[in-house]
Amino acid sequence: VSITLVGTILIVEDSPSELQLMSHYLEESGYNVIQATGAKEALEKAQSQNPDVIVTDVVMPGMSGFELCRSLKRNPATQKVPIVICSSKNQEIDRLWAMRQGADAYVTKPYTRDQLLRAIKSVVI
């Protein structure tokens, strides 16, 4: 028996194709999806729409996913929201650095639908 916890996920990704793919995987799995194409937009949406999980890219124009992570964890309104970093940076040091910034899980690109869902389920209490 598989139990799917339906929740709302904020995806932060500046690549339209990646954003579309991730949204498709999550919507297909029953999640509600909020999209943001940059960190500034993500900070606003994280506060106004209270997502259950935030999935973010690392390399984005303006503010990186790591900086976004730190900002979210410093803000009392968003500090408890689990963050999944989704990045093409695949070295162990990148994963460790993400965790130091406050990330709760790390997925490397390219990822499968199952890898993404497992990471999200691992951070939802």
Give, region by region, the residue ranges found by the protein language model.
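Charged docking surfaces used in two-component/phosphorelay signaling
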Residues: 20-28
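Short hydrophobic/Thr-rich beta-strand motif most characteristic of the beta2 strand and flanking loop
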Residues: 30-37, 45
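Active-site beta3 strand of CheY-like receiver
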Residues: 49-55
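Receiver (REC) domain active-site loop signature in two-component systems and cognate sites
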Residues: 60
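C-terminal output helix
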Residues: 111-120
